[in-house]
Design a protein with these regions (language model features):
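Basic, glycine/lysine-rich polyanion-binding surfaces/domains
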Residues: 1-190
Length: 190
């Protein structure tokens, strides 16, 4: 296991206040930063996709790697297929690949993971994301690369809600937009 000597500081630290806000005590949206993100990108060469897919599935403890735009998980280990030849793995440290098979890149410090849940979460996100987030269209396990206020993000629908992977440099601005827009529904930061 790789040791992590760098002290992590949240990109949202200056504006992360827990509590209930807006709309007369009603809670339509719950916002949460998921701390201590461990995120690796695994890119396969086209001729080695099957081998790399099997290795990523084994590393996360799932039966098989997902197809493009999908995710699978076991416990806290998640395997997202963000592009046809690229996977993101969260929750674990992964072994290196031989250069002939593909590459591994640690993205842990480059993203902020925000979870958006609650009965109005879909409506809130559709104010910013050009995706059909209805339950029948963007089902749990769906993954999309999209734009949030002109910033490229990755969105995954987990079993509990919407998981946003925001570029660290834009995370605070996007967080502020989420909070401002969520006020109309009433929201809680946990």
């Amino acid at each position: 296991m790789i040791s992590n000597p760098i002290k992590r500081v949240s990109a949202l630290a200056s504006d992360y206040t827990q509590g209930r806000f807006g709309a007369d005590g009603k809670i339509g949206v719950v916002l949460k930063e998921v701390p201590d993100l461990t995120l690796y990108q695994v890119a396969a060469w086209p001729d080695n996709l099957a081998t790399v897919s099997a290795k990523t599935a084994e590393a996360t403890g799932v039966e098989a790697a997902p197809g493009p735009g999908r995710a699978v998980w076991k416990g806290n280990h998640v395997l997202l297929r963000v592009e046809p030849l690229k996977f993101w793995i969260t929750g674990i440290f992964i072994p290196q690949l031989p250069p002939a098979e593909g590459t591994v890149l640690d993205l842990s410090h480059s993203r902020t993971h925000v979870r958006v849940t609650g009965p109005q979460a879909q409506i809130l996100l559709n104010r910013y994301l050009p995706l059909d987030l209805r339950n029948q269209s963007f089902v749990p396990g769906s993954v999309a690369s999209t734009a949030f206020h002109h910033v490229g993000i990755t969105l995954w629908r987990s079993e509990v809600g919407f998981e946003l992977f925001l570029p660290r440099g834009f995370a605070l601005s996007l967080w502020e937009l989420l909070r401002q827009s969520a006020a109309q529904f009433g929201y809680e930061v946990t």
